[in-house]
């Protein structure tokens, strides 16, 4: 691990991005101090985050999301040097120092480039020409650029992302460290004196690649302008010991410009760090940015450091109350990348050796270096940020106990706890929390809630795909357990409620439907008469009936039980929430009754997400909608089956519930009556026709008898009468009416 760390450190110090971005600084810095309050605002290079370094087309194609420009509020505290804000992200495969040195003073002030992020925070500081002269004075040789370009074009394997051979050892680490030190301290030569190089080099020569958190004495509050090196020198002092987390095994990791994480693993975590110590408000307005702006409070009793959230796979930001050691509680291993960083998955105990503390005379001679105690420790591709602040030493035990408790509760994995120092408990506020002290709240413009809540999200790169999960870890402090639980429940209801509701519905697929499943289970409702106030609510009726529909056909061996739990603020207002257990052997699939305000906009308290390893509980409204949809589909299915049964008389509908739609005796009787009445009418008409025909036939027969008698009397012969009957000419007028009637 030591060899690979040294190779990475050497590669970090020799990136060609450093050289080109430094030369870009010289051109863009002003030649004379600007006037008014708008000084320090300069346009940035359009290709500040994806400048070319050889063949970087692959890295340029990684930026797919538009850039987001973040600005501080104008009414906030006075801002310090824009060099405090020099940690942004470079190309997707570049290490942390490239982002530190590449994005310079003017590239942070205002964003005009495609992927650059600007800040309008330096409104009261003039940038003199001496800074540009210091930048030009500290140009490094072009041989380092050629070394890195050759390493890029040599086509190393992804397993060895350093690009250097085994021959380069800690000697090159020390050399590059010295170069970075001279370069970093030159940028603030006029404002603060550099720390001796022996002290700075000792920061990176520890065998554990760890840094010392030095606690200087509290200075006089004379620093309105502060030191511009507060975020430059420390990270560059840590330069060679940084084990190049950006050059991970997966070089195709897309670094999202809208998030701007400083570390690029396959999945990187970003954390809102909330350091609050002294009367100084550490103010970072960007969740994904590694920019820190040291703010001077209205009563500047002390100037403390602002933290830069260098996000690795698992970052930790700790506000140190004094000189102490970062234990392994917050040390991380990249568990989320077993395929790329398997060699680094050992718990690293960052043991920090103590450096000599500056005495009182040094404190007097270095009044502007009060904000330099910000050291970045990068171990195995992860970042740990420690911010020291002039507070009481007694808080050390408190933080150490919190770190140990964090390790016990939450094992070291993808998520980490970020404990905050002091007595500030604004971090534990939920989304409905309040801003207790505006000067001491570090809010994030990217986070959904700006009230001091810190979350940890995993960004999924293009190589990782969809195999990622978002975590939210909260540290309860000062007894704010209920608010933490409420925030955790909000996360559970927002991220996994839809999936869980679909899981509940999918469990109904292979189950047979009974009569009780298709109807409202009123008996289940009658058993709840112990709660008369709840029974009066229509929503409770519908939820109980829907719960019976959803939970009954799950497993024949699992029984559904109901039990009463604690009533909270108002016992008359209660809520039903369902928890579907994951284990079939467990006999309890319960419907928990919890008292909450009945307003639909309020937070519905849900059971703990990690409880019993079960499915996350459904929110009340979402569960109600899903159950209503299921019940509607079942009723439609019932009607379809009834219609099909009506078409085939042989099929029986006894398995279906008895309802007016199932029997339908009246429509059949009506149809038969109609048919009978029609038949009777037809029969009557036919009878009338028959009677009419009979009457006409009788008339015809009577006429024939009368004619025959006259013929007999006249002729006295029967032959004439016989011929007259069959002769149409003689009998035409006599037989014609009879013929028409018969037809």
From Swiss-Prot:
Keyword terms of this UniProt record: Coiled coil
Keyword Transcription regulation among record annotations: no
Region (Disordered): 1-125, 156-175
Coiled coil: 672-713
Domain of life: Eukaryota
Biased composition (Polar residues): 81-102
Regions of compositional bias (Low complexity) in chain numbering: 29-56
Annotated family: Belongs to the CCSER family.
Identification of the protein by name: Serine-rich coiled-coil domain-containing protein 1
